[in-house]
């Protein structure tokens, strides 16, 4: 009888653990996905339309230098090109890959944006490009993390 009670207790514990594991799979990351998407949307709109002051609010502290760098390299010719564009950049989040419970990568397609390639050269319009934007969750919010200025992903043929 003692053996059956122990076996029953063990099965009950395993069932409880399995249930907890299954329900925790519904949310394997911190923060809400809606908040993550909102961060990506707002950042993409600000950054790719050259509203760097707004983009600055959405990056982590280590990334601020990249936004400041981009803003410091805007010239009058760039401003004139931006004003001449019939509409601003548009974008679409293609996918989100959660790399851990507090980090993610958002894959974004950006269309009709003005790109600054090389410092000192004129910017040019890009019809479409894909970007991978890294994010991390800290202080109850998702933040964009930059290790350089965002660059288009290379196409694999």
Kindly give the residue locations of the regions a language model identified.
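Short, low-complexity N-terminal intrinsically disordered segments enriched in polar/charged residues
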Residues: 24-49, 57
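Residue-level signal for short amphipathic helical patches enriched in basic/charged
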Residues: 20, 47-50, 62
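Exposed beta-sheet edge and beta->alpha loop/turn motif
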Residues: 98-157
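Intrinsically disordered, low-complexity segments enriched in polar/charged residues with Gly/Pro
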Residues: 6-7, 32-33, 82-84, 119-123
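Extracellular/secretory pathway and lumenal proteins
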Residues: 15-17, 29, 149
